[in-house]
């Protein structure tokens, strides 16, 4: 989610700046720090109906993928792989109205008790896969919800989250069960700001019915247009269009209410996914192994006894 007035909030600027420095990516515009706005406006990123709140600002739907192990043991580090695919050749409309590379971000909602693995617990091989990504908890009370981004999509359309599983022997609130894991992933900027206003990565429509009487190109650095519409009663309404979208109507054209005046510049989108993993009890695995060994042993014993019985029968027949 994005906004143009991020600099008004010192805390948000500090957090966004730290994230950008940490990942070595210093070209992220403040308007692209979308995870911050979900954290600011929603206590929980997943609503009761299962919808992740990032969809409030990122209106287009795009696919995402989530891969987790089928089962994990307690107090172990494992990988959760997030994929946010998109065509790397395309560019989006930046906040300044100019073409820009797409960034990606994600929110991973883990079961309670699961959390980001400490650095000293992450194997070197996994650290290589993680790269320079910086993950942060959604809040101090929700360490099981992790956010990342915005980061360059050309480098991180696939992200590896290092996760530490809980130990029910130490945390009595956790049980050996089958758990859901939820993902929200995005590529590109949003179409709506948290206050409900449109970004320049959106379609702009006619506020009234009438005739387009003038289309004026603005001379500001960010570009844009002023489209004047004259209604049937003779009133004029001016629709200001920021730099980025292209005007698709012409002077003298009759338009209706909400008819698009511009193209849709958005090339990104948001998607949700989910997976399941089992927090496996080691004692169950040990019990299963013992059962299998006992079963195999019994089968071998029966085969040997059968062969021994056949030998005795054969000897009696020969006698």
Swiss-Prot record:
Pfam families: Apocytochr_F_C (PF01333), Apocytochr_F_N (PF16639). GO terms for molecular function: electron transfer activity; heme binding; iron ion binding. The keyword Thylakoid applies. It is a single-pass membrane protein. InterPro entries: Cyt-f_TM (IPR024058), Cyt_f (IPR002325), Cyt_f_lg_dom (IPR024094), Cyt_f_lg_dom_sf (IPR036826), Rudment_hybrid_motif (IPR011054). Gene3D superfamilies: 2.40.50.100, Cytochrome f large domain, Single helix bin. Heme binds at residues 34, 54, 57-58. Binds 1 heme group covalently. One of its GO terms (biological process) is photosynthesis. It is found in: Plastid, Chloroplast thylakoid membrane. Its cofactor is heme. The 4 large subunits of the cytochrome b6-f complex are cytochrome b6, subunit IV (17 kDa polypeptide, petD), cytochrome f and the Rieske protein, while the 4 small subunits are PetG, PetL, PetM and PetN. The complex functions as a dimer. Belongs to the cytochrome f family. This is Cytochrome f. The gene is petA.
